[in-house]
């Protein structure tokens, strides 16, 4: 099997983001975005997906974190798409229900070639430290649209915003790990013979 890796660089007037991803990794990460809480969530994503991830971002944080978080999602989504290649032999679908203390999140993925986010998770607090919690949805929308996969996220329980966000990142990581995993079969998992 050839390496399933993706390398993406994006430079705009607002941000510069570099991503290197290995789908068949061990969860090794090196992340620096200038936003410590977001770094922690991306590290959590890498650890629980077992995707090796190097992600660096420099953005206009003096304005706010929106551009940095969204562009990180754009680049990570594109890296996932590149690493999946023609999707021959993948599971295609993945889902997980993940607790984090009081929080419980369901995530489901279809690596269908169609980018869509359905996000049903209200945040009790507008901020966790310096991190704007409405950016969680923006990150996952950019990830799903640019990765060209369906992603459903539903919060089932939770009152602590940090725990809610962490359970979301872990649930998505576990879902993508399953969906991107190799089924042991051959061929494209679609009656269309393409994804």
Swiss-Prot record:
Localization in the cell: Cytoplasm
Stored Pfam families: IGPD (PF00475)
Annotated metabolic or biological route of this protein: Amino-acid biosynthesis; L-histidine biosynthesis; L-histidine from 5-phospho-alpha-D-ribose 1-diphosphate: step 6/9
Record GO biological process: L-histidine biosynthetic process
Catalytic activity: D-erythro-1-(imidazol-4-yl)glycerol 3-phosphate = 3-(imidazol-4-yl)-2-oxopropyl phosphate + H2O
Annotated coiled-coil segments of the chain: none
Keyword RNA-binding: no
Keyword terms: Amino-acid biosynthesis, Cytoplasm, Histidine biosynthesis, Lyase
GO terms assigned for molecular function: imidazoleglycerol-phosphate dehydratase activity
Domain of life: Bacteria
GO cellular component terms given for this protein: cytoplasm
Enzyme Commission numbers on file: 4.2.1.19
InterPro entries, per database record: IGPD_sf (IPR038494), ImidazoleglycerolP_deHydtase (IPR000807), ImidazoleglycerP_deHydtase_CS (IPR020565), Ribosomal_Su5_D2-typ_SF (IPR020568)
Classification via NCBIfam families: PRK00951.2-1, PRK00951.2-4
PANTHER family, per the entry: IMIDAZOLEGLYCEROL-PHOSPHATE DEHYDRATASE (PTHR23133:SF2), IMIDAZOLEGLYCEROL-PHOSPHATE DEHYDRATASE HIS7 (PTHR23133)
Similarity comment: family membership: Belongs to the imidazoleglycerol-phosphate dehydratase family.
Descriptive protein name: Imidazoleglycerol-phosphate dehydratase
Biological source species: Pelotomaculum thermopropionicum (strain DSM 13744 / JCM 10971 / SI)
Record gene name: hisB
